[in-house]
């Protein structure tokens, strides 16, 4: 009887355990574990793939806005977002911010005060390592910031802004080192890539992207004098192979941009991917896309590493020339070159008559490159479809001045693409034609959904396997930076940058804002218009205070200099020097408020009436 009693008690215990395990509280599906987005492209190999699947093909249409935070009233917002342990880190030209990743509450804000005049007010984000954030500045400083407090730990001048050098890219992180490069190709700098100690900012090594003297590649500059100001800057972050200790760096265009005859030869290492030993900076190999480029077709986005179906290590690059290039890392041979936008190559180099080319100088693949979808085994890339007529001019080198030696006229129409490509052959698997340029980050997920956005302000979600649009929702501002996903507290989030003014801008640009999405309770679909993103009433077109040219200079730098030049010398937009001899103050205000179709419309959503008056006052003094 004792044995029988023990058996009965045992059976009852088993039944009780089963009942407990089957109770609704226990069997309810657990949310995903907390996950971070550690770097500009998520991982150092550049793949941007997320293993999260709470948001999937079946429910992505029910994404809704959780919160948003306006980081500034105007200007560029192209930063790649980073999320570490519940905090989102982001930047604009001068500010670094830490924001709660679930409710957009600001934790701290670090404001950098330039020590010299900015070259170009742009920044692409921060790198994170050992509790520190690292970023560059428009006056060529490298900063280390405490991630917990926002306090600046050290800063190091690593370039000379008086000759056009600045830092727009996110440093790469490798075993106590920071790898960063100077931007400023179009100003006629001599580009270089450098490594610095994370603890002190001390330089460890450097590699000159424009070789001279006995350096490898110097013979590709047939006129050695032209290499003094040959360009070759770095616009964006680098990619790392942690196992081999290699850094894959995209290198920008040669200078002058539009007169290749001034610099005969292949002009290494411009428009190239260079592979360096991360320990020493020694070059291992390179792949050049556009020798002796005369159309500003630089490599502006980070390469991406993956393995093809045959087990070969591959590197893929999206270029401003409109191609996606796949290169076998073992043979160092090109495997495919797939067009990812409209192609119409100019038949000759630019001249005073002008040459028509597709893509134009701000077309093709811009600062966010290809992603790799591990679920569908495909590469996904966004691009800009925008043609232009380029005219060359006299070459004049003045340190610190733009050295385009020409200008361009855009086509009125500009669109974009999101394209999925077979990683073995480069064959196109599907494509989506967007109504506006696509430059935002591409993020595939294990939920079978790929996220991105366009410069028309649309946040997009695709079915990864087919390219079917599952969600298209207005954010109130152009998407030009990070699109990332992470999980906190059992919930998957998607965070984006919305609101940007740049040479790719048009229409309503919106105010630079962080926007965070998650699945809505009850499956409510995301709204296609946002009441929280309101514009200044059109009738409020009178400045309340006298125009302030000093404030106007600051606003001009954020919103106008990309097209018109820091000093109004003209870039892709017309020169504004001496505009006071053609327009009075009222006419200048009217021109800003009612621009041509080729200009961004900044009023009233980005600049209010007071800001317009301030900018007009500054422009009148150029």
Predicted features by range, described:
Residues 10-23:
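Bacterial N-terminal signal peptides
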Residues 246, 453, 495-499, 547-549, ...:
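Extracytoplasmic electron-transfer domains, predominantly the class I c-type cytochrome c fold
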Residues 145, 191-202, 266-281, 332, ...:
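Beta-propeller blade signature
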Residues 34-41, 74-94, 118-142, 166-190, ...:
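Repeat-blade elements of multi-bladed beta-propeller folds
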Residues 55-58, 99-100, 145-146, 196, ...:
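Hydrophobic/aromatic beta-strand positions that recur at structurally equivalent sites within the blades
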């Amino acid at each position: 009887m004792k044995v029988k009693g023990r058996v009965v008690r045992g059976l009852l215990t088993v039944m009780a355990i089963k009942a407990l395990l089957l109770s609704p509280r226990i069997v309810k599906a657990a949310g995903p574990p907390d996950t971070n987005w550690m770097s500009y492209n998520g991982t150092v190999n550049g793949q941007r793939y997320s293993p999260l699947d709470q948001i999937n093909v079946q429910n992505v249409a029910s994404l809704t806005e959780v919160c948003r935070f306006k980081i500034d009233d105007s200007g560029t917002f192209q930063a790649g977002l980073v999320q570490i342990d519940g905090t989102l880190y982001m930047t604009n030209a001068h500010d670094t911010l830490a924001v709660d990743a679930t409710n957009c509450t600001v934790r701290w804000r670090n404001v950098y005060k330039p020590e010299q005049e900015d070259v170009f007010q742009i920044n692409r984000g921060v790198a994170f390592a050992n509790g520190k954030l690292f970023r560059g500045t428009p006056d060529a400083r490298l900063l280390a910031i405490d991630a917990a407090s926002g306090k600046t730990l050290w800063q190091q001048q690593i370039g000379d802004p008086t000759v056009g050098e600045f830092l727009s890219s996110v440093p790469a992180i490798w075993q106590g080192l920071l790898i960063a490069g100077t931007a400023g190709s179009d100003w006629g700098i001599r580009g270089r890539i450098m490594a610095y100690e994370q603890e002190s900012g001390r330089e460890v090594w450097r590699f000159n992207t424009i070789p001279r003297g006995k350096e490898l590649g110097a013979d590709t500059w047939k006129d050695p004098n032209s290499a003094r100001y040959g360009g070759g800057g770095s616009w964006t972050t680098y990619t790392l192979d942690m196992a081999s200790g290699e850094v894959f760096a995209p290198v920008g265009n040669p200078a002058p941009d539009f007169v290749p005859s001034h610099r005969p030869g292949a002009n290494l290492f411009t428009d190239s991917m260079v592979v360096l030993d991360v320990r020493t900076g020694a070059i291992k190999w390179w792949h050049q896309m556009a020798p002796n480029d005369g159309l500003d077709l630089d490599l502006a986005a980070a390469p991406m590493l993956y393995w093809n179906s045959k087990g070969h290590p591959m590197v893929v690059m999206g270029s401003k020339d409109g191609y996606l290039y796949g290169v076998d890392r073992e043979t160092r041979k090109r495997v495919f070159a797939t067009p990812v936008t409209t192609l119409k190559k100019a038949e000759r180099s630019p001249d005073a008559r002008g040459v028509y080319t597709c893509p134009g100088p701000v077309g093709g693949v811009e600062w966010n490159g290809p992603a790799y979808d591990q679920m569908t085994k495909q590469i996904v890339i966004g691009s800009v479809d925008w043609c232009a007529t380029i005219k060359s001019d006299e070459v004049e080198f003045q340190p610190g001045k733009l050295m385009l030696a020409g200008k361009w006229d855009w086509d009125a129409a500009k669109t974009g693409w999101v394209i999925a490509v077979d990683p073995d052959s480069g064959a196109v698997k599907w494509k989506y034609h967007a109504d506006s340029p696509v430059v935002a980050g591409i993020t595939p997920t294990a939920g079978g959904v790929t996220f991105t956005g366009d410069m028309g302000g649309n946040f997009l979600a695709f079915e990864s396997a087919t390219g079917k649009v599952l969600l298209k929702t207005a954010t109130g501002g152009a998407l030009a930076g990070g699109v990332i996903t992470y999980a906190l507290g059992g919930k998957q989030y998607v965070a984006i940058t919305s609101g940007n003014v740049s040479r790719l801008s048009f229409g309503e640009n919106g105010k630079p804002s962080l926007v965070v999405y998650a699945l809505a309770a009850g499956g409510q679909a995301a709204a296609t218009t946002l009441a929280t993103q309101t514009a200044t009433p059109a009738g409020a077109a009178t400045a309340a205070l006298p125009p302030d040219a000093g404030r106007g200079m600051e606003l001009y730098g954020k919103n106008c200099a990309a097209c018109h030049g820091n000093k109004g010398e003209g870039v892709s937009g017309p020169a504004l020097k001496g505009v006071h001899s053609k327009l009075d103050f009222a006419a200048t205000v009217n021109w800003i408020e009612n621009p041509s179709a080729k200009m961004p419309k900044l009023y009233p959503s980005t600049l209010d009436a007071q800001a317009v008056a301030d900018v007009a006052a500054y422009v009148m003094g150029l």
